Amino acid sequence: MEKTKPAAPSSVPRHVAIIMDGNNRWAKKRLLPGVAGHKAGVDAVRAVIEVCAKSGVEVLTLFAFSSENWQRPAEEVGALMELFFSALRREAKRLDENNISLRIIGDRSRFHPELQAAMREAEAVTAGNNRFILQIAANYGGQWDIAQAAQRLAREVQAGHLRPEDITPGLLQTCLATGDLPLPDLCIRTGGEHRISNFLLWQLAYAELYFSDLYWPDFKHEAMRNALADFASRQRRFGKTSEQVEAGARA
């Protein structure tokens, strides 16, 4: 991919979502075990956080572990859980020092109680920070998210607090795991695959999609800046024509 200039501040996405793909293939290419790729990917996470925070991005959501990833070999899943646990303990202080708030979305019930406790602790330590929000999607699936939002609304209807006809797309959106945050403007997937893999299905309705052939451990500062620059070059129409968008920009 050719080098491009960094995005101008006025065209920086408020919310960037990333599907971090390619860790296993990165490791396999180097004749290493899969977990080595996941460990190497932590450096890419740090690099992307740094670029996003400095560029004015408000929210970064990383797809760390999908609800379908439990189907992977037990050894790999176990290694991922250990890596997640150690990263939470190690990185929470670093995030707090940089005024970054950590949030974790997804169904936590399947995680070990110690890991759940580490999640709560890391969130609590960084809760008061306001420079930037790092959101980790763990045991998350877009279909699960929509279903749990529908269940919340159904309980409100059942309790007599809400009429079915009052349920709107906007109301349902507030019940999603990301309900209090801006919708993603840009979704990046690394690793050369062109799909969104059950990630933020509702939220990505109007997001710009950016696909990189780089494996996640190789997606660092320059790659992230290139993605932001590509976003800045696009015209977001939200169903309108180019002429309408341009006229609105001139008004």
From Swiss-Prot:
<keyword id="KW-0961">Cell wall biogenesis/degradation</keyword>
<feature type="binding site">
    <location>
        <position position="208"/>
    </location>
    <ligand>
        <name>Mg(2+)</name>
    </ligand>
</feature>
<keyword id="KW-0573">Peptidoglycan synthesis</keyword>
<feature type="active site" description="Proton acceptor">
    <location>
        <position position="69"/>
    </location>
</feature>
<dbReference type="InterPro" id="IPR036424">
    <property type="entry name" value="UPP_synth-like_sf"/>
</dbReference>
<feature type="binding site">
    <location>
        <position position="70"/>
    </location>
    <ligand>
        <name>substrate</name>
    </ligand>
</feature>
<protein>
    <recommendedName>
        <fullName>Ditrans,polycis-undecaprenyl-diphosphate synthase ((2E,6E)-farnesyl-diphosphate specific)</fullName>
        <ecNumber>2.5.1.31</ecNumber>
    </recommendedName>
</protein>
<dbReference type="GO" id="GO:0071555">
    <property type="term" value="P:cell wall organization"/>
</dbReference>
<keyword id="KW-0133">Cell shape</keyword>
<feature type="binding site">
    <location>
        <position position="72"/>
    </location>
    <ligand>
        <name>substrate</name>
    </ligand>
</feature>
<feature type="active site">
    <location>
        <position position="21"/>
    </location>
</feature>
<comment type="similarity">
    <text>Belongs to the UPP synthase family.</text>
</comment>
<dbReference type="GO" id="GO:0009252">
    <property type="term" value="P:peptidoglycan biosynthetic process"/>
</dbReference>
<dbReference type="GO" id="GO:0000287">
    <property type="term" value="F:magnesium ion binding"/>
</dbReference>
<feature type="binding site">
    <location>
        <position position="21"/>
    </location>
    <ligand>
        <name>Mg(2+)</name>
    </ligand>
</feature>
<keyword id="KW-0808">Transferase</keyword>
<feature type="binding site">
    <location>
        <position position="38"/>
    </location>
    <ligand>
        <name>substrate</name>
    </ligand>
</feature>
<keyword id="KW-0460">Magnesium</keyword>
<feature type="binding site">
    <location>
        <position position="189"/>
    </location>
    <ligand>
        <name>substrate</name>
    </ligand>
</feature>
<comment type="function">
    <text>Catalyzes the sequential condensation of isopentenyl diphosphate (IPP) with (2E,6E)-farnesyl diphosphate (E,E-FPP) to yield (2Z,6Z,10Z,14Z,18Z,22Z,26Z,30Z,34E,38E)-undecaprenyl diphosphate (di-trans,octa-cis-UPP). UPP is the precursor of glycosyl carrier lipid in the biosynthesis of bacterial cell wall polysaccharide components such as peptidoglycan and lipopolysaccharide.</text>
</comment>
<dbReference type="GO" id="GO:0008360">
    <property type="term" value="P:regulation of cell shape"/>
</dbReference>
<feature type="binding site">
    <location>
        <begin position="195"/>
        <end position="197"/>
    </location>
    <ligand>
        <name>substrate</name>
    </ligand>
</feature>
<feature type="binding site">
    <location>
        <begin position="66"/>
        <end position="68"/>
    </location>
    <ligand>
        <name>substrate</name>
    </ligand>
</feature>
<dbReference type="GO" id="GO:0016094">
    <property type="term" value="P:polyprenol biosynthetic process"/>
</dbReference>
<keyword id="KW-0479">Metal-binding</keyword>
<dbReference type="GO" id="GO:0005829">
    <property type="term" value="C:cytosol"/>
</dbReference>
<dbReference type="Pfam" id="PF01255">
    <property type="entry name" value="Prenyltransf"/>
</dbReference>
<feature type="binding site">
    <location>
        <position position="26"/>
    </location>
    <ligand>
        <name>substrate</name>
    </ligand>
</feature>
<comment type="subunit">
    <text>Homodimer.</text>
</comment>
<dbReference type="InterPro" id="IPR001441">
    <property type="entry name" value="UPP_synth-like"/>
</dbReference>
<dbReference type="GO" id="GO:0008834">
    <property type="term" value="F:ditrans,polycis-undecaprenyl-diphosphate synthase [(2E,6E)-farnesyl-diphosphate specific] activity"/>
</dbReference>
<feature type="binding site">
    <location>
        <begin position="22"/>
        <end position="25"/>
    </location>
    <ligand>
        <name>substrate</name>
    </ligand>
</feature>
<dbReference type="InterPro" id="IPR018520">
    <property type="entry name" value="UPP_synth-like_CS"/>
</dbReference>
